[in-house]
């Protein structure tokens, strides 16, 4: 089958993917001397590891939908054979020549997850190819729909509709409930995956794809559309980022401060300030 071809390619790309990029420290989310699981991992090296793992598992690619395996009649909902379904020709895709790369390809891309160090996995592990496949689909949509933040937010809220039913738990499932579901095959929290994708773009170095206020507004719209689902997920992300400020890149610390102030201004500055009171008590005497 086709399995031999990607395996041969992976052998050739291993030396490139395993070599650290000369500029990786310039775009690292956290200080390179700190052992931070959430960042500092090159997307290229991650994908190399993920693809090798997937090859060993027979290319299951569990997160990819397979609609042709469950074809049903629109009126009777009865199963239909795939051969009887009306085929639609795929349009020709024209790739511009030459492709304008711009400035971004000069720097490597690192994978950031604000949910990487939790006691329970609510987002795909970085060793799982699903983390790259789902993140890629979400990031592409976020950056391509920059002209309509509301449509972007609605898409992020409904991401479970675009993947197999076993991929995600029901929206707004409590975090404590995730502990009970922990096992060999555990579905992920769709709102965590969505928030993770937005933060990966908001904290992209050296610069984000769009103006930072766009990503601010997407998170705000998500909270307005599904507050019961997004608010708890966003709260855990905020706590992680706050606790990581000492090791975070200074530019990203400023971005976090700007976003947090902007976000709270839309919701009456409501936050559990008592959580941080003890840590910052020394500043109250100034």
What are these regions (language model features)?
Residues 1-286:
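Eukaryotic alpha-helical solenoid repeat scaffolds
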